Design a protein with these regions (language model features):
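Non-catalytic cap/lid and distal C-terminal segments of serine-dependent acyl enzymes
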Residues: 1-370
Length: 370
């Protein structure tokens, strides 16, 4: 049974409940003086509390995927990666592995699609970043052999792991199910974290004498994917979305590069670049770039292109409600803005899982095929 399986979590909860009941029933017998009684009380308390902490820890890990397996938890996951050469590779996208999506018919690409584990080589930025590429089943079907597919870049928060987009937030499975049910058109997902120069949080900026992260996302990544896969190359074929830091980056890239991305979606996004010990000095005193990294300032002082934006927040539980409302007020034609406002939510996977299905449907409606 895997670390994140429902069976393990259920067993932990049952053990905690059983020990709690046992403590209540046995406590009168152990209320006497004497070493045995004292040791019995201490043992029951330790066992019950350990079981409760284990259940809570397993539930938190299942939600946030801090560790993916028992070996990962115990520090035994040390096997080196193996580079695999595949025909899908190009000069700027190296395919190093393939895997089945967790969907019905996932064993066959033409019925379940396929996920490629890749390394994207940034020729202009000099950044190489790992990523996952989800190809929908239609990509492998003869009837669509000449079709160019729309692409959505999907970003995690900081520091994030790209694997969480697959196993935790279930982007490929959600896209597959929404397309199968006719709610959205099939699209390719390029999934990665915004931390392309770890451990630094660059806030998707081109840092002077540092990582050129904005260039990587706005120029290198679209060019690399277009060289490797059957995708459209116009702005109407490309969208970008993410949660938290990834949401800020998605809105920023779509706002500043409408000639590349027709749509940007920020789930629980913030609207001004963070500046803290994880980011370091992003602007080196360049106030123009600091202002440009403030999306609310940019909406007021820079031309707005024809991109569409989706922003999400909650009436209770999230700290970006006021900023989101201000962002909505400031978007002007030809740009467009839509929103999702939950009654209550938080800065967590559970909230984003509620927003991802409608966000993907929204994104599909803004993008076209090549």
């Amino acid at each position: 049974m895997g670390l994140t399986s429902n069976k393990v979590l259920a067993l932990a909860v049952l053990a905690a409940v059983a020990l709690f009941v046992a403590t209540i029933r046995l406590w009168p017998r152990l209320s006497h003086r004497g070493r045995r009684a004292v040791l019995g009380r201490v043992g029951l308390l330790l066992a019950t509390q350990s079981a409760i902490f284990a259940a809570v820890g397993l539930a938190a890990n299942k939600s946030f995927l801090f560790y993916g397996s028992w070996a990962d938890l115990l520090g035994r996951e040390q096997e080196m990666g193996v580079v695999v050469d595949h025909s899908a590779s190009s000069r700027t996208v190296k395919v190093v592995g393939k895997q089945r999506p967790d969907v019905p018919g996932g064993a066959r690409p033409e019925t379940g699609g396929q996920i490629h584990k890749v390394v994207i080589v940034g020729e202009r930025s000099g950044i190489d970043s790992p990523a996952y590429v989800y190809l929908p089943p239609e990509y492998f079907q003869p009837a669509h052999a000449s079709r160019a597919f729309p692409v959505t870049v999907v970003l995690t928060g900081y520091p994030g792991t790209a694997e969480n987009l697959i196993t935790g937030l279930e982007y490929p499975r959600t896209a597959f199910m929404q397309a199968r049910e006719g709610r959205m058109r099939p699209m390719i997902l390029v999934m990665l974290r915004p931390t392309v120069a770890p451990p630094r949080d660059t806030e998707c900026a081109d840092v002077p004498d540092g990582p050129q992260t904005e260039t990587f996302f706005a120029q290198d990544l679209p060019a690399a994917v277009a060289q490797t896969y059957r995708v459209g190359t116009g702005p109407r074929n490309w969208g970008i979305m993410g949660n938290s830091t990834g949401g800020y980056c998605a809105l920023k890239i779509a706002l500043h590069h409408p000639g590349r991305f027709a749509a940007g979606a920020g789930l629980s996004a913030y609207y001004k670049a963070a500046e803290d010990p994880t980011t370091g000095d992003l602007f080196h005193g360049n106030q123009a770039e600091r202002r440009r990294a403030n999306l609310l300032w940019s909406l007021d002082h820079r031309p707005q292109g024809a991109s569409s934006f989706l922003v999400t927040t909650s009436e209770q539980g999230e700290g970006n409600l006021a900023g989101t409302r201000e962002f909505i007020r400031k978007v002007k034609a030809p740009a467009r803005v839509s929103s999702i406002t939950l009654e209550s939510g938080g800065h967590n996977f559970n909230t984003w899982r509620r927003e991802i299905p409608p966000a993907l449907v929204w994104m599909s409606g803004r993008l076209g095929t090549g």
